[in-house]
Amino acid sequence: MTRSPFRRLVFGTLRRLLYLWVRSETINQSSFTLNLDRSRPVFYALQSPSISDLAVIDTECRKAGLPRPVLSVAVGNLIEPAAFFYLTPSPDWLGRQDKRGAPPTLERVVAAVSQNPGEDAQIIPVSVFWGQSPDRESSAWKLLFADSWAVTGRLRRLVSILILGRKTRVQFSAPIHMRELVGENKGYELTLRMTQRLLRVHFRNLKSAVIGPDVSHRRTVVKGLLDEPLVKQAIIEEAEREHITQEKARERALSYGNEIASDYTYSVIRFMEVVLSWFWNKIYDGIKVSHIEGVQEVAPGHEVIYVPCHRSHIDYLLLSYLLFRNGLTPPHIAAGINLNMPVVGGLLRRGGAFFMRRTFKGNPLYTAVFTEYLHTLFIKGFPVEYFVEGGRSRTGRMLQPKTGMLAITLRSFLRNSRMPIVFIPVYIGYERVLEGRTYLGELRGATKKKESIFDIFKVIGALKQRFGQVSVNFGAPIKLAEFLDGEQPDWREQQLDPQFRPEWLSETTHRLGERVAQHLNEAAAVNPMNLVAVALLSTQRLALDDQAMERVLDLYLTLLRAVPYSPHTTLPEGDGRSLIEHVKGMDLLAEQKDALGKILYLNEQNAVLMTYYRNNVLHIFALPSLLASFFQSSSRMTREQILRYTRALYPFLQSELFIRWPLNELDDVVDQWLAAFVEQGLLRFKKDAYVRPEPSSREFVLLTLLSRAIAQTLQRFYMAIALLLNSGQNTLSPEQLEDLCTVMAQRLSILHGLNAPEFFDKSLFRHFIQTLLDLGVLRKDSAGKLSYHPMLGELAEGAAKRVLPAEIRLSIRQVALHSNEEEQDVGTDQGAA
């Protein structure tokens, strides 16, 4: 087409005419530099002949500064008049396809590289998508226009250009280096066939990743579930158990399937894209996306399961929007049945949501239908999204993973592992969450209300506020097969029956949940709200003067940059001053001026709200805060002392906050933090020991503020131990200890003026007690009562002296003693009665 000057003139004219209507964009600009050697010749591989595709690719190459496909290129002595070829040859005049031969250009390139050891050629697979439709067979109209798995004719392509040309996307992939393939010394013919095979597999996987796998209509999928052995058996058992006919049980199963299944509709996806583009840029200050290129690399050829943290109802919409905008198929999303509300439920279902009940208990037929539906999605390669936390986090911290969906995923993979599964953690960070005021009420003890359509209007009423920016970070992928290889090396040899439940499933699922939570926290997006919250909530009066606040924020930024939490963690740009101005602009910081300057403070309402944003990043500050705590009671400590107490307390912090480092890496990380402290003047290293600054110094004030980030967490730990020790051996059950801890924490929060309702969160005490049991610190007797090691008191007191002030320890012991006396009085009264 572009071999002669005349044809190039015609091509240029056609391209200009095409772009009177067409608008195109490249999906992944970052891939342009991925292993691309600009000194080596570049060829572009297109899947099938299309002058419109070539015109779009040529335009995108010009925009990106890449070599153009329509210009000549040299490989040694070989001069090719154009730098592109079609993997599938053009049909002959009778429309017949020649599937035997390789593209002539590719044949000549392979020969040139084979014959000249110093030469190389880079082949970039490139695809053009006219529209991006994830539902393949639900509409004849969309099948006619959007890219699909059907062969596209000239008339269909013309209509596609007219209808979808303004939403055209180009995907450039990493180049294939011919020198590497030729270097395998397999001969010309085999190298040629190997190159063709690589390109064919690449195009097939890429198409699946971008426009979605080939899928039947929703009705066909739901009806197909009823013919699966697992569901058929459940129908028979349901009929016997409920004393109904099998036909009636089958109808019940069908109704469950219709209740569950999504109804992906492309028009809704496009509608949401338009609406949400306005929303993110009108309500929020846009979206900052990090590390999505890792998803684009791993998605082809994998069943992708997105596992985001859950902070807001708009999480459902946000991830689908971002994936669609970045050329990836929006996932099928697990949503609670409570969201299947009038109007909203239908919209969510057409946007990819499938609905699940909060509990499957007592309904084996529903369980079978739901399990089989998920299995169908997995084996067909549909991207899926679910929240391992179960519900939205009201406290801002990562919730303990709910393992139900993970267990279903694991069992499905054990049944059929042909499609490799990869989990993609997605951290979603809001500078201001839409439901913030609702969470504020719930944190203060208000009963959690059931969602309704009217909640939307409450949120809309708050939209006049400034909400800042949204950050979305994609974390390190977790490949399920590799995870299982580490946990259960013989998993491939075990039976594949749908009912198979290996003994190790529960424990392995629990560890998978922990791994996902850790990877989510690794991808945290630290924002100005988080840092200001950490700083002000560490003060006694929730206030700092303007200059001191700037110094604290500058210190935190410096420390976090010196000791990065993980490669996937992101930090805000700018310095402490810019962070202060940013948060002030969101009306969350109050300001008071006097003759000495400005004081920044939090009012009572915002102080509680800011605990949410502090908790988002508490896992990042936990270890440096713990190290700083050691120097509140001790003026000097050796490295060995620091490591000993850190190792003693770290497992409990790690378990609660899902901190990333295993115990065998802890010493190195502690050394990095100590070095950073010394660099910033927070500590001095003198005579084989670390020495704190003078108590009257500015550096000691900074060290003290840093130590308070996890002070309440450490107090809760000490509180539980104190109550247990006061009660004695084999006296309390875990549930009784949990209740006592909650009451004691409420009392202490009043006595010490702690305005943080999560301080007496029952679930945190429950998890700490379970961690003590898991680590063998506590044991349960036959009656379910707790016993502990005789040295527990001495060890706990020794650690507490290092991290908690004497007055706090004394107050906790006194309240614990008083609580124990009250418990004994209640027991005596009940016995007398």
UniProtKB/Swiss-Prot annotation:
The keyword Nuclease does not apply. GO terms for biological process: CDP-diacylglycerol biosynthetic process; fatty acid metabolic process. GO terms for cellular component: plasma membrane. InterPro entries: GPAT/DHAPAT, GPAT/DHAPAT_C, GPAT/DHAPAT_LPLAT, GPAT_PlsB, Plipid/glycerol_acylTrfase. It is a peripheral membrane protein. The HXXXXD motif is essential for acyltransferase activity and may constitute the binding site for the phosphate moiety of the glycerol-3-phosphate. Belongs to the GPAT/DAPAT family. This is Glycerol-3-phosphate acyltransferase. It comes from Pseudomonas syringae pv. syringae (strain B728a). The lineage of its organism: Bacteria, Pseudomonadati, Pseudomonadota, Gammaproteobacteria, Pseudomonadales.
